[in-house]
Amino acid sequence: MSTESMIRDVELAEEQLPKKAGGPQGSRRCWCLSLFSFLLVAGATTLFCLLHFGVIGPQREEQFSSGPPFRPLAQTLTLRSASQNDNDKPVAHVVANQQAEEELQWLSKRANALLANGMGLSDNQLVVPSDGLYLIYSQVLFKGQGCPSYLLLTHTVSRLAVSYPEKVNLLSAIKSPCQKETPEGAERKPWYEPIYLGGVFQLQKGDRLSAEVNLPQYLDFADSGQIYFGVIAL
């Protein structure tokens, strides 16, 4: 082969090289365009999902973060009704008459006493206005000086029910301040004995409750807050 023919073959190969390279470059451009389109669609889909579910963008819940939580009207009315029902429950707290001599007499018209929401005081008894559970409580304070004889002090809360004609004791307690009689000529030392009673009972409308002692002459009327009787609806 001559030198001229070899040179001609090389020139022909160089002319054909761009044509052969054009095929791979075209397919590469198509692949890049497809990848760009896929990424664009995927990005748009992701952005839509984030906006739809509130991950990004303005959040309405933050507008109420500084104020009180939103409460439906029905829930507000229910809570208000429950509060009003609690305030409407019957309640009584009466205190002893400090002017009574050797008698336990209950008074409701005092600064530290009350009758509310249907509770009544009649014949020294508290009258229940409606059926339900009630907390009943009472306290008395006995005092004396020396022991002329053996003493038994009792405090009792009784119920006179509409459905039962006889009085029934609900709460009762006994205390003895004197174990033995004070001898003649010995020092007569003062003594004090408090008794507190309390319990929960099912009562009916019209029931009458009384708090009594067996020896009222030993009651200490020095302070009205020491002797009291009360009922609270639960």
UniProtKB/Swiss-Prot annotation:
<dbReference type="GO" id="GO:0006955">
    <property type="term" value="P:immune response"/>
</dbReference>
<dbReference type="GO" id="GO:0051046">
    <property type="term" value="P:regulation of secretion"/>
</dbReference>
<dbReference type="GO" id="GO:0005886">
    <property type="term" value="C:plasma membrane"/>
</dbReference>
<comment type="function">
    <text>Cytokine that binds to TNFRSF1A/TNFR1 and TNFRSF1B/TNFBR. It is mainly secreted by macrophages and can induce cell death of certain tumor cell lines. It is potent pyrogen causing fever by direct action or by stimulation of interleukin-1 secretion and is implicated in the induction of cachexia, Under certain conditions it can stimulate cell proliferation and induce cell differentiation. Induces insulin resistance in adipocytes via inhibition of insulin-induced IRS1 tyrosine phosphorylation and insulin-induced glucose uptake.</text>
</comment>
<dbReference type="GO" id="GO:0043123">
    <property type="term" value="P:positive regulation of canonical NF-kappaB signal transduction"/>
</dbReference>
<dbReference type="GO" id="GO:0005125">
    <property type="term" value="F:cytokine activity"/>
</dbReference>
<dbReference type="GO" id="GO:0043507">
    <property type="term" value="P:positive regulation of JUN kinase activity"/>
</dbReference>
<feature type="transmembrane region" description="Helical; Signal-anchor for type II membrane protein">
    <location>
        <begin position="36"/>
        <end position="56"/>
    </location>
</feature>
<keyword id="KW-1133">Transmembrane helix</keyword>
<dbReference type="GO" id="GO:0043065">
    <property type="term" value="P:positive regulation of apoptotic process"/>
</dbReference>
<feature type="site" description="Cleavage; by SPPL2A or SPPL2B">
    <location>
        <begin position="34"/>
        <end position="35"/>
    </location>
</feature>
<dbReference type="GO" id="GO:0043406">
    <property type="term" value="P:positive regulation of MAP kinase activity"/>
</dbReference>
<feature type="site" description="Cleavage; by SPPL2A or SPPL2B">
    <location>
        <begin position="39"/>
        <end position="40"/>
    </location>
</feature>
<keyword id="KW-0449">Lipoprotein</keyword>
<feature type="site" description="Cleavage; by ADAM17">
    <location>
        <begin position="79"/>
        <end position="80"/>
    </location>
</feature>
<dbReference type="InterPro" id="IPR021184">
    <property type="entry name" value="TNF_CS"/>
</dbReference>
<dbReference type="InterPro" id="IPR006053">
    <property type="entry name" value="TNF"/>
</dbReference>
<feature type="topological domain" description="Cytoplasmic">
    <location>
        <begin position="1"/>
        <end position="35"/>
    </location>
</feature>
<keyword id="KW-0597">Phosphoprotein</keyword>
<feature type="lipid moiety-binding region" description="N6-myristoyl lysine">
    <location>
        <position position="20"/>
    </location>
</feature>
<feature type="lipid moiety-binding region" description="N6-myristoyl lysine">
    <location>
        <position position="19"/>
    </location>
</feature>
<dbReference type="GO" id="GO:0005164">
    <property type="term" value="F:tumor necrosis factor receptor binding"/>
</dbReference>
<comment type="similarity">
    <text>Belongs to the tumor necrosis factor family.</text>
</comment>
<dbReference type="GO" id="GO:0097527">
    <property type="term" value="P:necroptotic signaling pathway"/>
</dbReference>
<keyword id="KW-0735">Signal-anchor</keyword>
<dbReference type="GO" id="GO:0045944">
    <property type="term" value="P:positive regulation of transcription by RNA polymerase II"/>
</dbReference>
<feature type="site" description="Cleavage; by SPPL2A or SPPL2B">
    <location>
        <begin position="51"/>
        <end position="52"/>
    </location>
</feature>
<keyword id="KW-1003">Cell membrane</keyword>
<keyword id="KW-0202">Cytokine</keyword>
<keyword id="KW-1015">Disulfide bond</keyword>
<dbReference type="InterPro" id="IPR008983">
    <property type="entry name" value="Tumour_necrosis_fac-like_dom"/>
</dbReference>
<dbReference type="GO" id="GO:2001238">
    <property type="term" value="P:positive regulation of extrinsic apoptotic signaling pathway"/>
</dbReference>
<dbReference type="GO" id="GO:0043242">
    <property type="term" value="P:negative regulation of protein-containing complex disassembly"/>
</dbReference>
<feature type="modified residue" description="Phosphoserine; by CK1">
    <location>
        <position position="2"/>
    </location>
</feature>
<feature type="disulfide bond">
    <location>
        <begin position="147"/>
        <end position="178"/>
    </location>
</feature>
<dbReference type="GO" id="GO:0001934">
    <property type="term" value="P:positive regulation of protein phosphorylation"/>
</dbReference>
<dbReference type="GO" id="GO:0065008">
    <property type="term" value="P:regulation of biological quality"/>
</dbReference>
<keyword id="KW-0472">Membrane</keyword>
<feature type="domain" description="THD">
    <location>
        <begin position="90"/>
        <end position="234"/>
    </location>
</feature>
<dbReference type="Pfam" id="PF00229">
    <property type="entry name" value="TNF"/>
</dbReference>
<dbReference type="InterPro" id="IPR002959">
    <property type="entry name" value="TNF_alpha"/>
</dbReference>
<dbReference type="GO" id="GO:0043243">
    <property type="term" value="P:positive regulation of protein-containing complex disassembly"/>
</dbReference>
